[in-house]
Amino acid sequence: YYTDIPAGPLAIKNVADLYLYDNVTALLKVTGAQIKEWLEMSAGQFNQIDPKSKEPQQLINSSYRSYNYDVIDGLTYKFDLTQPNKYDREGKLVNPDASRVRDLAYQGKPIDLNQTFLVVTNNYRATGNFPGVKDAAEKRLLNLENRQAIIDYIVSEKTINPSADGNWSFVPNITNADIRFASSDNARAHLAGQDAISYVGPSTQAGFAEYRLIVKEKANQVEDTTKKESEKSPKGSETADQTKREAPKATVGAS
């Protein structure tokens, strides 16, 4: 689904549109390998795409719980939608050899699967059974509600101009596919000046319209080494020397 907060004065009640639940902030200590599995689970939000098909294909997997789709900021990565999902919606391993997460990088370099990261999320994710999360080496719940953190940020900044930093995308091997998704009909007013999305027409769902995703080739891709490294490195392993290093910080957006 979507939320539509108009430009102009922002009321505290608008925070409920951005964050529905009374979760508290949590901190996880995980490895690069665990982060990859975390993202493999999140990739279940998207359907598998047949790049050779000329028929319209739906981008969003409607059976996947949208609040389980996480974006991990501080990293860059891509999803290969031609691959099947590795996990089902419950987190059960269904395709052991599948790998949708590509070009996973930290600070512009392929991620070290044994490196330790601190990830900020919420208590719902931290205490759940998510692949890559359930075996975290350390979990801490902080005395701070996520909604209050957003409110504090807005009050501190006075004026905010939120925008996506584009740290994730799709592997451009589906450039000829007709990929569709639904959103607000009002969203077409924001399509000017961009060429990644086009308006198709009204949807059969009340309050929605249908859009087409346009995937294009991009230059300067990070070399994808995550699959090779995962094959030679046991998932979740770390040496004593690696645990002594200061853990890099990443943040995660989880509903």
What is each PLM-predicted segment?
Residues 1-238, 244-253:
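Catalytic centers of hydrolytic enzymes
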